[in-house]
């Protein structure tokens, strides 16, 4: 099997895993509600919380983080197996993670209308390089707590993780790939938050704890 075919398979696996809309599934199964008809219409944990089900929001957050991490870990396992068989293997782990992030934002099952990718990128960060995951989580929680804006927390976390990757100890080639893919995910994440950014600038963004 050619390297190109392997990369396509890894990307497809990551995308399909990332495109599973756990927020929508959980809200429908246990909350009898279509989360797309609630609040912002987003399928992520923040909007699931607006249904009044903290338990479902927590599960959504867990699974959205998990699918990003799982995509990276599965790709890592495959790369390791390939190395054992052939003596060489490309590092395809972050390609799978970026694909999972893309799948969450643009899931094929929902007409390519998905979430904003914060939790999934957090999972990718933890699995790709745990330091980036810790930086992401701390920056997200602190900025959300200080500003009381969930959107600000997610955006600051993604930017902080991308900056941290610039100091990642790795070969030049792998380092450049990580910087490029983390930067790409962050740019897309910011684009997915463009509505939030407009509301922040106009003073109309909802704060954490505000009634919807």
Curated annotation (Swiss-Prot):
TM segment ranges: 6-26, 56-76, 92-112, 122-142, 150-170, 171-191
Primary location: membrane
Top-rank taxon: Bacteria
PANTHER family (UniProt xref): GLYCEROL-3-PHOSPHATE ACYLTRANSFERASE-RELATED, INNER MEMBRANE PROTEIN YGIH
Signal peptide (residue range): none
Catalytic class of the enzyme: transferase
Purpose: Catalyzes the transfer of an acyl group from acyl-phosphate (acyl-PO(4)) to glycerol-3-phosphate (G3P) to form lysophosphatidic acid (LPA). This enzyme utilizes acyl-phosphate as fatty acyl donor, but not acyl-CoA or acyl-ACP.
Catalytic activity entry: an acyl phosphate + sn-glycerol 3-phosphate = a 1-acyl-sn-glycero-3-phosphate + phosphate
Lineage summary: Bacteria, Pseudomonadati, Pseudomonadota, Alphaproteobacteria, Sphingomonadales
Family statement drawn from the similarity comment of this UniProt entry: Belongs to the PlsY family.
Subcellular location: Cell inner membrane
GO molecular function terms attached to this record: acyl-phosphate glycerol-3-phosphate acyltransferase activity
UniProt protein name: Glycerol-3-phosphate acyltransferase
Keyword terms of this UniProt record: Cell inner membrane, Cell membrane, Lipid biosynthesis, Lipid metabolism, Membrane, Phospholipid biosynthesis, Phospholipid metabolism, Transferase, Transmembrane, Transmembrane helix
EC assignment: 2.3.1.275
Topology within the bilayer: Multi-pass membrane protein
Cellular compartments per GO CC: plasma membrane
Subunit-level organization: Probably interacts with PlsX.
């Amino acid at each position: 099997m050619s390297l190109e075919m392997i990369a396509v398979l890894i990307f497809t696996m990551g995308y399909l895993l990332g495109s599973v809309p756990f927020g929508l599934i959980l809200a429908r199964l246990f909350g009898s509600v279509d989360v797309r008809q609630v609040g912002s219409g987003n399928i992520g944990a923040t909007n699931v919380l607006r249904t009044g089900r903290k338990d479902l929001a927590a599960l959504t957050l867990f699974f959205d983080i998990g699918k990003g991490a799982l995509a990276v870990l599965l790709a890592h396992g495959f790369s390791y197996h390939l190395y054992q068989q052939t003596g060489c293997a490309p590092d395809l782990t972050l390609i799978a993670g970026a694909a999972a992030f893309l799948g969450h934002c643009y899931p094929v099952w929902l007409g390519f209308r998905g979430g904003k990718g914060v939790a999934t990128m957090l999972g990718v960060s933890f699995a790709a390089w745990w330091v980036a995951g810790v930086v992401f989580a701390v920056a997200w929680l602190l900025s959300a707590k200080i500003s009381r804006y969930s959107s600000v927390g997610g955006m600051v976390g993604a930017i902080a993780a991308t900056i941290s990757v610039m100091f990642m100890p790795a070969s030049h080639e792998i380092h450049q790939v990580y910087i490029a893919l983390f930067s790409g995910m962050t740019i897309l994440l910011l684009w997915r938050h463009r509505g939030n950014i407009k509301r922040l600038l106009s003073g109309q963004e909802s704060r954490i704890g505000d009634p919807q």
